[in-house]
Design a protein with these regions (language model features):
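Long, charge-rich, low-complexity alpha-helical segments
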Residues: 1-10, 341
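Iron-sulfur (Fe-S) cluster-binding segments and ferredoxin-like electron-carrier domains
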Residues: 33-46, 301, 346-383
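Radical SAM enzyme [4Fe-4S]-AdoMet core and its adjacent flexible, acidic
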Residues: 145-153, 160, 164-277, 281, ...
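Residue-level detector of conserved catalytic or cofactor/ligand-binding positions
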Residues: 385-392
Length: 392
């Protein structure tokens, strides 16, 4: 790889890896990724080969311009790949590190965690993300296995194992039409019962449609689509954030970290947010499927957003392609005038493009479905944010 090819790129190249594609032991009602297996129905086994694993790790490390390299293992359910696979991955990372520091994080539903897994994560300094949607009543509403059985107790068992072995972990919670109505019960569960100090709240918004490729979820390019019943409303989202923020800012700042709150403050002071949905541009976080196909984003795994395959193109060629550049710039360039005139445009930059399927007040396309909720939240926190900025 030529030096001149990659030196202009100041940001780390970042690609999430799907070692088992969309394969999962759960069948959560709202999951946006389960159906992606339909894109690969002609392939009997949706598992990453050792050959591809080595090719990806070598090229991914050698494509970086920074001394730190982050590997993110995502699913499907990542732990459906045996432990030996990840041991092999670490061996390959060491083989090709070339003096770079390698970090690993892995997202899991937690139900398959064992002492052996947790010992491995602790010994190798993995950051483990656990998907859990709050207390049992909230979590089990949508997060069930393929037999329709609830998963809460198995997830809690997994969390307790992580704690037992001293594994660093955080929580990723989907906020839906049900649990959004109980923000304090929701937040206090993570704080008081789990003592989870790093929490990510993700609002679920999906549209259902009939696609020729068999997928039921709408892509951004589809103008039709019926809002899925589990989707949160803008009003719910705004009330949810404001209610939790009021509790958090009085008692928990500096001790419990909520990603969206931290990212909002970052935008307020002119820093890069820690979450892509609130950044000005997209395109910095692609995803690679089990067979080497690379897509523009984890939420845009549709044929129309495929960048290529690692066996036909290099990661640098795909990540810095005209297609990916256009995809990334689209987030800002397609904002309707209502957003550009908004006092809080700097705080959300239109949020995630996948949610921008509404018409603005002037009839322009591209308004975010959650706009009213975000505006309510930003308006609520603005006085405190300004006070924080003015402090010496």
């Amino acid at each position: 790889m030529k030096e001149a090819t990659i030196t202009p790129f100041a940001k780390p190249l970042y690609i999430m890896t799907k070692p088992v594609g969309a394969v999962c032991n759960l069948a959560c009602d709202y999951c946006y990724y389960l159906e992606k297996s339909k894109l690969y129905e002609e392939q009997p086994r949706h598992v990453m080969s050792d050959e591809l694993l080595e090719k990806f790790i070598k090229e991914y490390i050698q494509s970086q311009t920074m001394p730190q390299v982050l590997f993110t293992w995502h699913g499907g359910e990542t732990l459906m790949r045996p432990l030996v696979f990840y041991k092999k991955a670490l061996e390959l990372q060491k083989k090709y590190a070339g003096g770079r520091t390698i970090d690993n994080c892995i997202q899991t539903n937690g139900t398959l965690l064992t002492d052996e897994w947790c010992e491995f994560f602790r010994e190798n300094n993995f950051l483990v993300g656990i998907s859990i949607d709050g207390p049992q009543e909230f979590h089990d509403e949508y997060r069930k296995n393929k037999m329709g059985q609830p998963s809460f107790y198995k997830v809690m068992k997994g969390i307790n194992l992580l704690k037992k072995h001293g594994v660093e972990w955080n929580a990723m919670a989907v906020v839906n039409d049900y649990n959004a109505d109980y923000p304090l019960d929701f937040y206090r569960f993570f704080r008081d019962e789990l003592d989870c100090h790093y929490i990510q709240f993700t609002p679920i918004v999906e549209r259902l449609s009939n696609r020729a490729d068999g997928l039921r979820l709408s892509s951004l390019k589809q103008k039709d689509g019926e809002l899925a019943s589990f989707s949160i409303t803008p009003e719910q989202w705004g009330n949810f954030l404001c209610t939790i923020f009021d509790e958090w800012v009085l008692n928990d700042v500096g001790n419990y970290y909520i990603q969206l709150f931290d990212s909002t403050l970052a935008n307020w002071v002119g820093q890069q947010p820690g979450i892509c949905s609130l950044a000005k541009y997209c395109g910095h976080a692609a995803v690679m499927e089990f067979n080497g196909d690379v897509y523009a984003c984890d939420h845009f795994v549709f044929p129309e957003y495929k960048l290529g395959n690692i066996y036909q193109k290099t990661l640098v060629e795909m990540m810095y392609s005209k297609e990916q550049e256009t995809f990334g710039a689209m987030k800002h360039n397609s904002l309707p005038q209502q957003c550009l005139n908004c006092s809080y445009e700097f705080a959300c930059h239109g949020e995630c493009p996948k949610n921008r399927f509404m018409l603005s007040k002037d009839g322009e396309p591209g308004l975010n479905y959650l706009c009213k909720g975000y505006y309510q939240f930003f308006d609520h926190v603005a006085p405190l944010s300004l006070i924080h900025i003015s402090e010496p």
